[in-house]
Amino acid sequence: MRTTLMTISIFLTTICQLSAQSGNAVILIQPYLQDATPHSIKISWETTFGEESVVEYGITPKLGKKARGIAFDVNFSSSRIHEVEITDLERFTEYYYRVRTGKTVSDIFQFKTPPFASDNKSFNMIAMSDMQIDHNNPNKWSEVVNDGVLQYLKKEMKGKLPDNLALVLLPGDLVENGTNYKQWKKDFFNPAERLFSQVPVYPVLGNHEKNSTFYFKYFSLPENGTPAYAEHWWYKDYGNTRVIGLDSNEGFRDLKQQYDWLEKVLDDTAKNADIDFVFAQLHHPHKSELWIPGEEKSSGKVVELLEDFSTKSGKPSVHFFGHTHGYSRGQSKDHKHLWVNVASAGGAIDNWGEFEGRDYDEFTVTQDEHGFVMVEVDADPVDPKFTIKRISRGNSNVARDNEMTDSITIWKRERKPKIPEIKSLKNETVDSMGVMLKAGKFTSNATGAFHAASHWQVSDSEDFSTLAFESWKQFENWYYLEDRQKNDDLTDEKTNRLKANTDYFWRVRYRDQNLNWTGWSEVGTFKTMD
C-alpha cells in the first residue's frame, strides 16, 4: 500500500509539474550583467523552467540581433539559470537588450561596454558589502540600492545609469546563508534588479556564502585565476584600472597558490603601461576598529603585497573589504595605499561599543552606519586620479539620505610638499622626562593641498637604524563619534621619557591629504641631562 501511495504521489507531482510547464515560464531573477569586456558581456537570468536561452540586443530599442546560450539546473528542480555571452560588441557603446525563454520575454534594459585603456575614458564604480538580511530591518538592502545608489546617481549625475556607472564591486556576504537557495532570489537579486540589469556586478566570497554551489552557479566571473580554484580569485580591467578579486575565507586564505598568483598579477600590472590604479577586494579585514574579533591575519599578507606594489610601481592601490558592519577609511603610513571598509549595505550594524574595538593609527574615519562607497576614476592620461566618497544612509539613531560623510582623492603622480623646517632642539640640552619637538608650517605648490599628517622620529643613532621614539599623527581621527585629533596642528609632538645623559637625533616629515610625503627634514640634535 505504501509503495502504491508513493507511486500515485510521484505521478500526481509529475502531472502538476507538466501542467505548470504547459504555460509560460516565469522569470524568477531578472537579467543581470557580468564579466564585461570592450567587445563582450555575459547576461544571466533564472526562470521557473525552460531550456531556451536567448538575448535579443542592438544599439536601438528595436534590437535586431540575437545570441544564444545555455541553461542549467540550480536546485534539482525545474528552475533554470540561463547564461548568454554576447561577443560581437563595439567598445564603449550603449546597447539595448532583453532576454527570452520560450514565450517569456523580459523588459528591455540597457548596458554600456567598457572602453580600451587607450581611450582615456573616466568612469565610476560602486563598492558595498555585507548586504545579508537583517531580520530586524529586512528591507535595508533594497533601500541602499534603490533609495541610495540609484537615487544618488540620478540626482548627482543625471543621464542614464549605464553612462554614469561602470561596475559594482561586492566584497562578500551577499546573503545570510549561501546554502539556502531561496535567499539568493528573495534577499539578494530581487532587491537589486534595477541596478544589476544595467551595470555589471563583480562579487567575491564572504563567510556567509559558505563556499556554496549556488554562488558559483549564479556568478560567472573572469577565469584568469588559478585553474584549480576557478572564480575564487580573478582580475578584471576597466580602462586604466585593474580590479582584483580575492578569497579571504577559511580553506582558501592561506593557500600558497593564491599568493603566488597575486604576486604574479601585481608584477605584470607594474609592467603594464595601461594600468594606473589597482583596486583589490576581499571580505575579511586585516584591522577593524569596530570589531576586533572579525580581523584576519592573512589579509595582512594581501595588504603588504599591495603596499609593496604601489611603492615600487608608483601606482596607487586600494583594498576594499567588509565583514565588519560599518565604514572605515585609512591609509598606509609609507605607501599610497588605502584601506576601505565598504559595509554595511544591509546587515545589522556593528555599533560603537557593542564589540571590542581599537583605535588604529591607519584609520582616520570610522562610522557605524549603512551606506556605500562611490569611486570616481579620472583617466586623464597626463595626471590620472581617483576619488573615493562615502555615501551614508545613517543608522537607527541618525538618519542620513545619501549624505557624503567622507572623501579622499589620490593622484598617481607625486606632488610632494616642501620639506618642513625644524624649529627646536638644535644642539640643545634638555630634560629626559619628555621633549617637545617643533617644526615649521606646512607648504606646498599643489593647489588646495593641506597638512594631513606628520611623522616624527627620535634615535640615538645618526642613521636612525634604531628608534627611541616614533609618532605618526593624521589631521583627523574620527573614533567613537569624536575627532581625537581635533585642535592638533601637527607641527609639534612631545616624546615619551628618554634615556638620561644620551645624545639624540630627530627628524620629521609632512604629508598632504592626497598621501604625498615630503622628504625628511634636516636632522636636529639634543642631549638629555642626567
What is each PLM-predicted segment?
Residues 121-135, 240-250, 279-283, 337-344:
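Active-site-proximal beta-strand elements of phosphoester/diester hydrolases
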Residues 61-77, 127-151, 178, 217-226, ...:
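Acidic/histidine-rich helix-loop elements
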Residues 1-22:
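Bacterial Sec-dependent N-terminal signal peptides
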Residues 20-139, 155-163, 275, 385-505, ...:
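Acidic, histidine-bearing metal-coordination/catalytic regions of metal-dependent phosphoesterases
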Residues 121-204, 441-443, 453-455:
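Conserved, compact domain cores that house catalytic/ligand-binding motifs in diverse enzymes
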Residues 172, 269-294:
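Short acidic, glycine-rich surface-loop motifs adjacent to enzyme active sites
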Residues 30-36, 328, 332-416:
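Binuclear metal-dependent phosphoesterase catalytic core
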Residues 94-113, 179-272, 297-312, 326-363, ...:
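Extended active-site neighborhood of metal-dependent phosphoesterases/phosphodiesterases
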